[in-house]
């Protein structure tokens, strides 16, 4: 029986993770649930899964739940609560699906405690990949990617010699604005950005998908997970989202992983590896499949991908700067304080003004993240 903590249990990945657990309750057991502020949904999850520990990051939400909850689950709040849940001896695996930078410290503490990681929080590797992967190697724990692209790469690389890899081919849907040019994007609305053509995701990641920043984050994540140079990681726009990623080898052979656009597939694979089990996701019907098309990404229009490559190649503290600026810019766009194209300008300005710290420690990254967020907010509110 695998005992699991789900950090971010009320979000998109978290709720789908719980659906996987429902279907394999003989193999997977929830011991820890954690959410930001959705106390009502968390309470429902507690009543269903009966974990040993539940955490609300928001203290007000915690107080509301504590006032009415009468069960046996221990309730905690705040970052210390998240760390308690991520390091308890009641679990062996942590699903990190907290949004953005907030997932970094609990993930690091979980690794230090020897927990295996099912990673949905790609920002953890973007911001502190060198430190995270080094600690994972020291503790000899596994980091299994939950997102579809890196789960696909993992399967395509499984059992192969990394020295024989020519390219990692990371697929992208192209988002809701595929084929559009800069002029077309000047006045796009939040609602338009949130209309993703193939995937159902949270609001922040859907905006990142529209800007191609999400794919940029995945490029950096791939570099960290598989220790390949950036010139060996290529993004391919594949609008149908049937092929989730591919690996091309030195002999010209390409191995691809295909599947339906259902996040329960990569979640289940990460949690049940090396076993394969029946999944509730719909199987592909090749008789009904028509076209599989591929395009080169337009990085002149969708600058998020180019900015991520630049930040990744510079390394050090630069990916942290890029990520912090992006998170604040996306939040401002969702609140209709800036335009969609302003997101790129804000990220680029933050990167250009930053003097890179080559080998930052974890606390350096927290300080840099805080400073960049403050600077970006000041710029936005002055506009």
Question: Which residues fall in each region the model found?
Answer:
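Catalytic, metal-anchored helix/loop core of enzyme active sites in primary metabolism
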Residues: 1-383
């Amino acid at each position: 029986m695998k005992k699991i903590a789900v950090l971010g249990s009320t979000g998109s990945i978290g709720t789908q993770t719980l659906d996987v657990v429902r279907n394999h309750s003989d193999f997977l057991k929830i011991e820890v649930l954690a959410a930001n502020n959705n106390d009502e949904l968390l309470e429902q999850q507690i009543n269903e899964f009966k974990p040993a520990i539940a955490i609300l990051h928001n203290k007000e939400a915690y107080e509301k739940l504590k006032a009415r909850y009468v069960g046996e689950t221990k309730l905690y709040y705040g970052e210390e609560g998240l760390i308690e849940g991520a390091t308890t001896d009641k679990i062996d695996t942590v699903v990190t699906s907290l949004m953005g930078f907030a997932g970094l410290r609990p993930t690091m503490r979980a690794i230090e405690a020897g927990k295996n990681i099912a990673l949905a929080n790609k920002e953890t590797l973007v911001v502190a990949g060198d430190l995270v992967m080094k600690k994972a190697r020291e503790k000899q724990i596994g980091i299994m990617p939950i997102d579809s692209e890196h789960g696909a790469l993992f399967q395509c690389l499984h059992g192969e010699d990394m020295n024989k890899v020519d390219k990692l081919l990371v697929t992208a849907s192209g988002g809701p604005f595929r084929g559009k040019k800069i002029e077309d994007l000047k006045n796009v609305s939040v609602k338009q950005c949130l209309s993703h053509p193939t995937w159902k995701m949270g609001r922040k990641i859907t905006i990142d998908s529209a800007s191609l920043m999400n794919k940029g984050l995945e490029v950096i994540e791939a570099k960290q997970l598989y220790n390949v140079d950036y010139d060996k990681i290529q993004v391919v726009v594949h609008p149908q989202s049937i092929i989730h990623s591919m690996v091309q080898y030195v002999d010209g052979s390409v191995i691809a992983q295909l599947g339906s656009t259902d996040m329960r597939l990569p979640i289940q694979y990460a949690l049940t590896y090396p076993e394969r089990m029946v999944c509730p996701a719909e199987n592909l019907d090749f008789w009904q499949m028509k076209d599989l098309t591929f395009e080169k990404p337009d990085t002149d229009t969708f600058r998020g991908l180019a900015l991520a490559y630049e930040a990744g190649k510079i390394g050090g503290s630069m990916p942290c700067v890029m990520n912090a600026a992006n998170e604040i810019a996306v939040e401002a766009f969702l609140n209709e304080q800036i335009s969609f194209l302003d997101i790129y300008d804000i990220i680029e300005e933050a990167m250009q003004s930053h003097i890179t710290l080559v080998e930052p420690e974890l606390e350096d990254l927290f300080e840099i993240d805080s400073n960049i967020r403050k600077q970006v907010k000041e710029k936005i509110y002055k506009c």
